[in-house]
């Protein structure tokens, strides 16, 4: 069995960027309006899913909190606590302790994105922390919010463009997990980069 793990995205991205910057043939550009694809390839991670609010999404918001007193069992995490208001959807809370006084707590929904009451994340988290976990004194260190499409976005195939990540169908639709699949896809692309147009990606 593999232990459940969490990765600090900021540290992960910085490690990768620092590694890439060691290569003199790699350049970083921002705010590019036009890209010439005639003699190059584009690896695109931006999907067309944003306009599909009526489809099924896993959307969430989480806070990393720190408490004054010992409030968590740092050897046990609660992956899905369904003892909460479902509002005719699927709703659960997630608690991942880092120590006895620090934890990440998330509210997660599986639904469309049309209901304002479902995305009232701040009140959901406040009520859960104070009423369910019975923690009154805490401070928020970090906050995150996101939405993962539980459907494959229908991107229009373009010449010399490879869809990667969620845009490339790497999200596991049953769970929303994507990270491991992205690593495998990246390895495949790297292995076949010299002959990428003849691979099964196209």
Show which residues each predicted segment covers.
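Dinucleotide-binding Rossmann-like beta1-alpha1 core, especially the glycine-rich loop
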Residues: 1-19
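Short histidine-centered catalytic/ligand-binding loop motif
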Residues: 2-5, 109-115, 175
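Predominantly flavin-linked oxidoreductase catalytic cores and closely associated redox partners
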Residues: 14-139, 149-157
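Aromatic-anchored, charged helix-turn/loop surface patch used as a conserved interaction hotspot
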Residues: 57, 173-177
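Short FAD-binding loop at a beta-strand-to-alpha-helix junction that anchors the flavin cofactor
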Residues: 95, 100-102, 158-174
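An active-site-proximal "capping" alpha-helix that borders the catalytic cofactor pocket
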Residues: 125-130, 178-196
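Active-site-proximal substrate-binding core of FAD-dependent oxidoreductases
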Residues: 140, 150-154, 187-202
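Catalytic cores of enzymes that engage adenine nucleotides and/or redox cofactors via long glycine-rich
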Residues: 141-148, 166
């Amino acid at each position: 069995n593999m232990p459940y793990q969490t990765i600090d995205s900021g540290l992960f991205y910085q490690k990768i960027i620092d590694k890439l910057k060691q290569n003199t043939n790699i350049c970083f550009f921002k705010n590019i309006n036009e890209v010439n694809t005639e003699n190059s390839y584009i690896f695109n991670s931006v999907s067309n899913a944003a306009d599909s609010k009526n489809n099924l999404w896993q959307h969430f918001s989480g806070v990393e909190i720190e408490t004054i007193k010992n409030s968590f069992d740092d050897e046990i995490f609660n992956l899905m606590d369904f003892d909460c208001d479902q509002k005719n959807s699927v709703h659960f809370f997630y608690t991942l302790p880092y120590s006895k006084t620090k934890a990440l707590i998330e509210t997660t929904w599986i639904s469309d994105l049309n209901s304002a009451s479902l995305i009232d994340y701040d009140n959901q988290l406040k009520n859960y922390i104070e009423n369910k976990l019975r923690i009154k004194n805490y401070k928020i260190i970090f906050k995150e919010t996101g939405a993962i499409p539980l459907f494959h976005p229908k991107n229009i195939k373009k010449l010399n463009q490879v869809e990667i990540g969620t845009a490339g169908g790497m999200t596991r639709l049953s769970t929303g997990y994507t990270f491991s699949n992205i690593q495998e896809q990246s390895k495949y692309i790297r292995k076949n980069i010299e002959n990428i147009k003849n691979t099964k990606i196209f």
